[in-house]
Amino acid sequence: MLKLFSAFRKNKIWDFNGGIHPPEMKTQSNGTPLRQVPLAQRFVIPLKQHIGAEGELCVSVGDKVLRGQPLTRGRGKMLPVHAPTSGTVTAIAPHSTAHPSALAELSVIIDADGEDCWIPRDGWADYRTRSREELIERIHQFGVAGLGGAGFPTGVKLQGGGDKIETLIINAAECEPYITADDRLMQDCAAQVVEGIRILAHILQPREILIGIEDNKPQAISMLRAVLADSNDISLRVIPTKYPSGGAKQLTYILTGKQVPHGGRSSDIGVLMQNVGTAYAVKRAVIDGEPITERVVTLTGEAIARPGNVWARLGTPVRHLLNDAGFCPSADQMVIMGGPLMGFTLPWLDVPVVKITNCLLAPSANELGEPQEEQSCIRCSACADACPADLLPQQLYWFSKGQQHDKATTHNIADCIECGACAWVCPSNIPLVQYFRQEKAEIAAIRQEEKRAAEAKARFEARQARLEREKAARLERHKSAAVQPAAKDKDAIAAALARVKEKQAQATQPIVIKAGERPDNSAIIAAREARKAQARAKQAELQQTNDAATVADPRKTAVEAAIARAKARKLEQQQANAEPEEQVDPRKAAVEAAIARAKARKLEQQQANAEPEQQVDPRKAAVEAAIARAKARKLEQQQANAEPEQQVDPRKAAVEAAIARAKARKREQQPANAEPEEQVDPRKAAVEAAIARAKARKLEQQQANAVPEEQVDPRKAAVAAAIARAQAKKAAQQKVVNED
């Protein structure tokens, strides 16, 4: 009795809420064996035939490829695609693919050569000696994905299951009307399917393996039971026919009684599900060493003369398959990829077959009936009764129409499996699944935009934080640099601190006064002298720095000279425009000329004492000399135009002439006695000597043109001139001696 109850509990099945029983229409195509289709002339292989990102291209236009050769590289969730036959890559461009939107996706276009040559195949007949990681990597690199309709990469799914999988379920229900691809595959290739199941079990090591199949497939059930006759590790469960019992959550509940939580996965409850076609593809990848390049596709509908199931190469145009099956289109013929409830209408027939293509339905006009006009919802709740996911389709419909995305999300629109049961039973002919698909797409787009905005905000905040850190570090550096004394001031600060400490120490010492003795102030005097010497040294250093800064800038010197010349020109113009009655004092003019010459000599000395690297422009020196000569001539004219009543002292003029000649001789001697390092411009010295001689001649002329009424003693004048020359010579010699 205990064994009877155990057997009953072992084979127990559960039933889910909702569901419908539409006409099956499977007998049109499940009665004939699988057959091959002739190769098409051109194949279009989309790079993305799965959930996830497309792989990286590893071929280019003009390459020769063989069947099974990878066209892309698979990394992470990127699943590679392979060449369905041998040929030449003629283009890599966007092409419309099998999708409700009919958007173009990047595809590899291959022209077949007709030879259909395989790449070298390396099968692992002894797969049990391989590690779990090696088997998963081989399955992934051979492009195996879920062939039941989702297209999730099988290798990633097996890797994510890990060691927590207790139950492996093989989905053989195939509940949607018209589709018989899995049914025919189990009838013709039952042994290979079971071998693929054993490979999956070897990878996952589950406690139990369950095959769920509907009772409307008697031939497939018989073939599987025959293959599993000697096996005790795999259990075949026959379930009642009900749509959509082939859904992942529904079949999991039917076989185990466990429900997948909202927003969760079946692996959260220790269950992993694979399709019958996926198990067959795993067997071919591991044991035969063949990547997935073809799959079983059902060709059915009253518009097809020879319905059945065929081995269709991936990338084959839909038109080629339909024409091979005797397609007879009507005026408004439609072709549906998938079943009548979950499939979608193709915009044109040039789209290729992909990994998730399981059926091509070409119904006649009478087969599906006339399209009904959409009417208003009457709140009958028939859709809620039929929903297998226990949702409220009428509420989701209103939320979808009203763009109320938050409420739709709260009502678990993500759990909708888009089975179409609600639309099937709706008396108002509302295409509820279309509304739900659009709403889920909009929610996904909003979440993607929010994710991008959050990432952009995070990048902005990180940048702002980095800028704030850099600013704080910069301010800290500036603050420390301002507070920290310079290296040259550290000694002065240390000396000041030492003096303060010394004074404090002296203040604490008692003062002893002895009668008849003088106090010893030598230490204090020495300290005072040291401070004075230090202050003088510091002042001298600052003075040298300022002088160096002043002398070292030749441009500043030139600017100052130009300003002085401009001021001199302005004074000359003012004197020239003065009233005629104004009396001109020749001595004052001579003094001003001497001051101007002194300033000129000072500027020349500053330029001469500049850095050795400074180059003297001879043209500029010539221009300055010419300007000086012009000023001298102007002063001579002013003195000549003075009033004749002005009396000139010939002795004073003689003395000035002698002094001028002495200065001229001194200038001539200075270049010889100058330091060898000093660079002297010979042209400039010659110009200055010429100017001095001209001034001497001018003074001699003034003496000759003196007023005749004045009585001059020639002997006194000669004596005075001789004395002046002697004094000038003596002063020049004394200055030379001092300079040496």
UniProtKB/Swiss-Prot annotation:
- Localization terms from the record: Cell inner membrane
Q: InterPro entries in the record, alphabetically? A: 4Fe4S_Fe-S-bd, 4Fe4S_Fe_S_CS, Ion_transpt_RnfC/RsxC, Nuo51_FMN-bd, Nuo51_FMN-bd_sf, RnfC_N, Soluble_ligand-bd
User: Bound how, and how many: what does the cofactor note say?
Assistant: Binds 2 [4Fe-4S] clusters per subunit.
Location, primary (coarse class): membrane
* UniProt-annotated binding residues for [4Fe-4S] cluster 2: 387, 416, 419, 422
Gene Ontology BP terms: electron transport chain
Enzyme category, top tier:
translocase
Chain intervals for the UniProt region annotation (Disordered): 602-717
Keywords recorded for this protein, A-Z: 4Fe-4S, Cell inner membrane, Cell membrane, Electron transport, Iron, Iron-sulfur, Membrane, Metal-binding, Repeat, Translocase, Transport
Q: Locate the 4Fe-4S ferredoxin-type domain: which residues?
A: 369-397, 407-436
Which Pfam families does the record cross-reference, listed alphabetically? Complex1_51K (PF01512), Fer4_7 (PF12838), RnfC_N (PF13375), SLBB (PF10531)
SUPFAM superfamilies associated with the record: alpha-helical ferredoxin (SSF46548), Nqo1 FMN-binding domain-like (SSF142019)
Instruction: Please note every region of biased composition (Low complexity).
Output: 605-615, 637-647
Q: State any single GO MF term.
A: electron transfer activity
What cofactor(s) does the depicted protein rely on?
[4Fe-4S] cluster
Regarding the membrane, this protein is recorded as: Peripheral membrane protein
Q: Which GO terms describe its cellular component?
A: plasma membrane
Q: Which residues bind [4Fe-4S] cluster 1?
A: 377, 380, 383, 426
For this protein, the parts annotated as crossing the membrane are none
Report the superkingdom from the record: Bacteria
E.C. code: 7.-.-.-
Q: How does it assemble?
A: The complex is composed of six subunits: RsxA, RsxB, RsxC, RsxD, RsxE and RsxG.
Q: Would you identify the family this protein belongs to, as annotated?
A: Belongs to the 4Fe4S bacterial-type ferredoxin family. RnfC subfamily.
State what protein this is by name: Ion-translocating oxidoreductase complex subunit C
Q: Which organism is it from?
A: Escherichia coli (strain ATCC 8739 / DSM 1576 / NBRC 3972 / NCIMB 8545 / WDCM 00012 / Crooks)
Gene behind this protein:
rsxC
